[in-house]
Amino acid sequence: MCCEKWNHVAEMLLFIEDREEEYKILCLCSRAFVEDRKLYNLGLKGYYVKSSGNNAGDQGTEEEEDGHSNGTAESHSPNESDLDSEAKLMRSMGLPIQFGRMSSHENFEMSMNARNKAKVKQKRRKHQKRYLDEMVRESWRNDYEEDDLVVSDDPSSVEHCENNRTCEIQSKAGSEVENLPVENTLAPKLEVPENWEKYWNEYGEGLLWQSWQEKYPDQTLSSEPWNLPDTKEEWEQHYSQLYWYYLEQFQYWEAQGWTFTASQNCDKDVYTSHTEVDQNAESSLKADVMTFSSSPNIVEDEIPGSNDNDHNEIITAINNITVSAEKVEQSQLDSSQHCDEPLSEITGKECPASGGSDSCNGTPKENDISENRSSDQPAKELQESSGTNKGKHRPHHNGADGHESDDDPPEHKPSKVKRSHELDVDENPDSEVDDNGFLLGFKHGSGQKYGGIPNFSHRQVRYLEKNVKYKSKYLDLRKQMPVKSKHILFTEDSGKPFVVCKSKVRSKVEKFLKWVNERVDEETSQDSLSQNKMQDTCTSSDSEEQDMSLEKADNLMETRDPEPEKCQIISSATELEAEKSEVGSLVATVPENCSTEEIPNSPHAETEVEIKKKKKKNKNKKINDLPPEIASVPELAKYWAQRYRLFSRFDDGIKLDKEGWFSVTPEKIAEHIAGRVSQAFRCDVVVDAFCGVGGNTIQFALTGKRVIAIDIDPVKIDLARNNAEVYGIADKIEFICGDFLLLAPCLKADVVFLSPPWGGPDYATAETFDIRTMMSPDGFEIFRLSQKITNNIVYFLPRNADIDQVASLAGLGGQVEIEQNFLNNKLKTITAYFGDLIRRPALLKTSTSEAEV
């Protein structure tokens, strides 16, 4: 089947020199991802379990799991009548119906009932929490809509505002709590803070009694419902409802920064601007802005002339603010959307930091504002915006009244700057301009083009997928790593530069050898008597220290980079010889008695010998596991570990020759190509021009196609026939031993698959693979002959093939799709599709829409 992880990546336009744009070649770039890690791991372990067996095993386990959950109930349901008759018989005989424990059916029912109860409780908690949150939001939303004002400095108005609000909240809470079911009013497990206890001791009695009177207005005021037997239970229920309701509200508003000990000024400080100002000036601004009244009800109760005094105090407080113009302009973009709307909802004015003005009736004031805005600009705006007619605030968008104003200065309008990940390709063309397709991992060479097409003047790449650069980082595109910078010294004698590479490992080894030499010099500079004593009393500890020093040197030598650069390889031979000679000199300085007597008997030497023996045994085991034909050719050991990736039924009798190990297509990639061909259009006959051992031929036949397999080597034809018999589709394949160059004019088919030999594993060492000169036969010639059979051609090529040559196969003004085949996120091969096999983005959209309908 076709790979599920497939997508279009880009469109590449190749423009030809000295030709008009209409002759450009369109190259659609796509990627297909397949995985076969399981097959590779099985090859490393040395055994394989058939896919059919795996599927059967998986189905068996799934059936067992399903039977464990559902089969118990089903096993008892068909024999319920028998069980009932047996139970009656047992009961009539006086025998017990059950022994030891309950039946599995009852056990299952009890477990299901417990689960259902837990689910019901969980849903109840969620519903209760959601209901309370909605109730709180609705209550406060109505309060702000009905009471769009800010309290003045008058204490009486403050108390009046707070009392009205608390009464409304209590009445709403009482009416809403009545509707709650009894189960939801049970006391939840909440931590009771000390502040809540103080609050409840102070206000709880009044809240309870007020709500009770609203609930039962017919009762006398002198009655005590908590002592009467008729109303005692109702009072307890009423108490628990209000207690836990107000506790949750208290915790919610306390988390928002509200406290019952704070001044009752409706706490509008939450919506103040975040502009960086002096703390004293900011606090005075908050206090004055909070006292500014916009409600006609309160204005009527105030003393005449108080508005002018309040306005003057506000202006003087704002004038004390010292904010630089740069900070104000910088804060406009950051805090305009967070500051304008909340503060304007409270005061009916726009935030001073936003740089706009709003009159009391909601219409904008048009003012001439200079570029460098002074610090007293907000004061002027508030002074102009003062008035007697107070109206409800309308949302602020680009202008004060929600409409765009051409006279407003552009530097003060809120604007949104796109972030880097939101930029379009057209807006930032330099971000991912990739005319050579470097992000795609393509190779562009200077080889001869097909059909006499001259060189391409330039290329244009348009990416169809977002974040191609980011996604390509996690793919192994087999690119050459960039060479590190090196220090180049120019000698006076010759003009040729001398490259010097500094190795960290080399410097460490030099330091260690220098330290050892200094230590040896100190020991040799001692008196002759001490030297004789050392030779006479040489112990195993001395030899162990020297062994440790030698081991340290060996470890440093082993920690060299396993893949050094070329410059390191050139100088590594002489360096290693010098280092070995120095280490050898150290060994020579050790006294002979110690080296001949102590070291052989040391436990460290014994462990080294044992480790070497174990390594030899492991090597022998690995060699013995390989078949003789594989063990005789060391190059095939790598491919032997990948045998199940090449043929999943390898153990059923698959046969390969030496060249077949190198040239066969991995089964997952071959399966994907066959699936694409079968889904492209209705085709009956497929020609595999170079079938080899039958990797692609078998997959084409498995999709139900009639396959004509051609190869010039009779040995490969026999191997391909044997492998097809293993898969059970030999009757769908016609094997022909012959030269495709001679047989092509006589063939008729719907699709031609080309996978000529690439010249062995050495193809990967080339920077760019020339499909004309590095193939045998000529890659251009076999494509020309294939066009005589059909235009629907699949060309299977190495990953480093010259894309310009592949695109030239489409001809002037033609189209080609180049698909990158990723195996376990590693780029393995590329496949070029021609004719009706090309998947075009427009066709994909129409096909998906038709499938949805």
Swiss-Prot record:
GO cellular component: Cajal body; cytoplasm; cytosol; nucleolus; nucleus
Biased composition (Acidic residues): 424-435
Primary localization class, coarse: cytoplasm
Protein name stated in the entry: Trimethylguanosine synthase
Pfam families documented for this protein: Methyltransf_15
Keywords tagged on the record: Cytoplasm, Methyltransferase, Nucleus, Phosphoprotein, S-adenosyl-L-methionine, Transcription, Transcription regulation, Transferase
Species this protein is from: Mus musculus
Modified positions (Phosphoserine) in chain numbering: 81, 85, 92, 139, 152, 405, 431, 572
Phosphothreonine sites (modified residues): 61
